[in-house]
């Protein structure tokens, strides 16, 4: 696997106890704002001498005399900077670099969690706003979310003052909330990993030098440079600071220029026939020409280190600006690695290739084999999370709700007598009036979330998948996924992007869809046999990774608040009610497969009717998809987060009688519970009870950016929802 083959345990940015290499790969470092990553590198260099210039470049110099050798790698990733703050607390952004790296760069940030790095070194969580798919059939000419003019970042604030109270201000950089995921065959997917593999390789190289007390001939300077995406300014400075006889640049191979007089290429990875794991790429200006003397020296060192190296057509690293191009040393080499899905949230490379760069450099500069590091590990911990956080972070796509059902059962009061029906619904009946004259009341919240399911395994090892639920493909393709296997373990993969995504002028077909176009998942495997060896089978299910992020004040972000908030509200209500409700007939249902046709709730409704116990009233506890967003028209679905629960009077599946809407509103006001009511899109579980005589009165909480990784709630609305369920269970 090479020196870095062990680097495959991958926690998120927030897990500071994670492997050292992972912190190098996931620490935010938007162009011009690389200071945090520089400090992380410095902390990993031990006693090696390191200095930082006023461009932010970090230099480590070892030895003295001639020859003067320079090894360079970039630090920065493309991202955004806060360019404005709206009166209602949203952040406006400017892209860095100002020209988009590819046609889908902005779009792939839509409805995604992000991190804002403040002046005081805080990492503030936020999300990029996205359209809610449930509302779009009733909209006209919605935004495409494909340009900074249509981008807003939501940190949970309601005003400029709250934004600044959170520590966020103009010029603060914004980057994706990164998480690295190991794939098969030593591959890794993570945002910006194509900008960081050089940092990982060179820090490991320097640590190997120090551990081995190795000597290099002459003077060696290793430079970690800033602003590769902003015209190569850090590189330009280094070339004036260090007079080098020879230079090796480790980073993305830039595409060849269209002509000798064309502008320097941006550092987007070159298309290559080589795949991750097949070796190092050596950038050349003419693939057909014999290697020059310096490249031949590196080829010889690669052979001695048993490292594969392939010539690949590429331009020299970019240096922009208005002055003449700074010349590179005559002895110059450009090293990269094959990268899939470059400059997307799911770009993928092989850590074995990264390790090979360390091995090659060590062999070339020291003359011996490098020291292989020890295996890394994930450090996990933390106290038990509250109900909502625990439920939200449990995975359970439609038809695969076992883990969620287990969490619900564990949070129910001791002694709760539940049953699980053939559809997987969890049912709890309370009260002493079953079969009597009391009105039969049902509260139902669904446990499932949207996702995918393995349809078949392709001969090349990729998965062809079916959709479970609906949403915007823009929020999922080009991002990492988790494949949940029958034995309870997971494998990471990447949802592949549409054909042509990396071509100039590509435009994603816009509009709400049920994601039913053919979609593939890349796992890093090379054949169906390799995929089968991972234990993946037809029928295994797939989700986007997720994590609960507190935002400003009482707001929070996570995927699958729809409908884990509803599940939480029912649990909180049961805790408040206790397990005895004299004179009442109340059933609580945590249902399955709502996202694929209300199937679990339909099974419960049918069984109750067949047993002669049909519901009189059903309160479906589910999302009110809200237009409380700068991207949405407020013509309908206008319920503000933080202003209370919502009576979902009208949606696509039900119209609640006004007399009952008004009655719920009055009960809420009588009990001091903040309440709203309105019209939204989507369907609800209660709709399948109406055929058996029930009245459906859906109760909700307002949700921003539904069916995405950017979902945002106000936890005060969850409290209001659980309180109204408690009141209704006692008094309806």
Give residue ranges: language-model regions.
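N-terminal hydrophobic/helix-forming segments and targeting peptides
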Residues: 5-732
């Amino acid at each position: 696997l090479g020196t870095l083959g062990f680097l495959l345990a991958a926690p998120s940015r927030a897990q500071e106890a994670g492997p050292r290499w992972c912190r190098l790969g996931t620490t935010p470092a938007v162009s011009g704002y690389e200071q945090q990553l520089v400090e992380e590198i410095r902390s990993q260099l031990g006693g090696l001498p390191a200095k930082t210039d006023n461009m932010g470049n970090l230099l480590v110099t070892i030895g003295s005399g001639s020859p003067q050798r320079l090894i360079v790698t970039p630090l920065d990733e493309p991202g955004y900077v806060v360019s404005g703050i709206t009166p209602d607390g949203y952040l406006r952004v400017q892209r860095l670099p100002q020209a988009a790296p590819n046609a889908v760069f902005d779009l792939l940030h839509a409805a995604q969690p992000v991190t804002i790095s403040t002046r005081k070194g805080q990492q503030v969580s936020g999300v990029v706003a996205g359209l809610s798919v449930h509302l779009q059939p009733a909209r006209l000419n919605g935004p495409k979310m494909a340009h900074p003019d249509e981008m807003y970042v939501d940190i949970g604030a309601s005003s400029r003052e709250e934004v600044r109270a959170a520590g966020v201000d103009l010029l603060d950089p914004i980057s994706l909330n990164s998480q690295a995921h190991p794939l098969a065959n030593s591959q890794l997917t993570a945002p910006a990993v194509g900008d960081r593999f050089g940092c990982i390789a060179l820090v490991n190289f320097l640590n190997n030098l120090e551990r081995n007390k190795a000597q290099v001939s002459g003077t060696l300077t290793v430079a970690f440079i800033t602003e590769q995406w902003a015209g190569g300014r850090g590189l330009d400075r280094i070339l004036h600071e260090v007079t080098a006889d020879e230079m090796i640049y480790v980073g993305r191979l830039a595409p060849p220029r269209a002509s000798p007089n064309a502008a320097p290429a941006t550092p987007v990875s070159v298309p290559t026939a080589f795949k991750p794991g097949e070796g190092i790429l050596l950038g050349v200006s003419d693939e057909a020409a014999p290697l020059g003397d310096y490249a031949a020296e590196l080829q010889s060192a690669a052979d001695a280190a048993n490292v594969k190296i392939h010539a690949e057509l590429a331009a020299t690293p970019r240096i922009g600006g208005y002055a003449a191009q700074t010349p590179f040393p005559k002895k110059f080499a450009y090293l990269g690695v094959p990268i899939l899905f470059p400059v997307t949230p799911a770009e993928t490379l092989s850590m074995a290739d990264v390790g090979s760069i360390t091995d090659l450099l060590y062999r070339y500069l020291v003359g011996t084999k490098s020291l292989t590091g020890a295996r890394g590990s994930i450090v996990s911990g933390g106290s038990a999370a509250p109900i909502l956080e625990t439920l939200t972070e449990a995975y359970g796509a439609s038809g695969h709700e076992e883990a969620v059902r287990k969490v619900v059962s564990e949070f129910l009061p001791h002694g709760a007598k539940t049953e699980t029906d053939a559809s997987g619904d969890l049912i709890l009946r309370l009260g002493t009036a079953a079969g009597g004259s009391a009105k039969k009341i049902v509260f139902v919240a669904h446990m499932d979330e949207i996702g995918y399911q393995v349809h078949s395994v392709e001969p090349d090892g990729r998965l062809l998948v079916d959709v479970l639920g609906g949403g915007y493909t823009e929020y999922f393709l080009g991002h990492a996924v988790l494949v949940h296997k029958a034995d309870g373990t997971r494998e990471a993969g990447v949802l592949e992007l549409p054909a042509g995504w990396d071509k100039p002028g590509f435009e994603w077909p816009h509009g709400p869809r049920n994601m039913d176009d053919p979609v593939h998942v890349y796992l890093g495997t090379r054949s169906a046999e390799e995929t089968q060896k991972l234990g993946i089978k037809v029928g295994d299910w797939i989700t986007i990774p997720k994590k609960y992020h507190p935002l400003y004040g009482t707001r929070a972000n996570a995927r699958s608040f729809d409908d884990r908030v509803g599940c939480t509200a029912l649990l909180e209500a049961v805790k408040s009610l206790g397990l005895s409700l004299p004179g009442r007939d109340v059933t609580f249902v945590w249902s399955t497969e709502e996202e694929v046709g209300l199937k679990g709730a339909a099974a419960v409704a049918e069984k109750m009717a067949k047993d002669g116990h049909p519901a009189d009233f059903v309160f479906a506890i589910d999302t009110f998809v809200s237009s409380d967003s700068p991207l949405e028209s407020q013509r309908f679905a206008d319920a503000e987060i933080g202003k209370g629960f919502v009576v979902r009077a009208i949606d696509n599946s039900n119209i609640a009688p006004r007399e009952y809407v008004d009655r719920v509103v009055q009960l809420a006001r009588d009990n001091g519970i903040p309440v709203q009511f309105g019209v939204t899109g989507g369907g609800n579980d209660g709709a399948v009870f109406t055929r058996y005589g029930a009245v459906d009165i859906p109760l909700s909480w307002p949700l921003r950016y539904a069916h995405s990784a950017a979902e945002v709630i106000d936890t005060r609305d969850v409290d209001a929802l659980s309180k109204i369920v408690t009141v209704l269970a006692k008094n309806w």
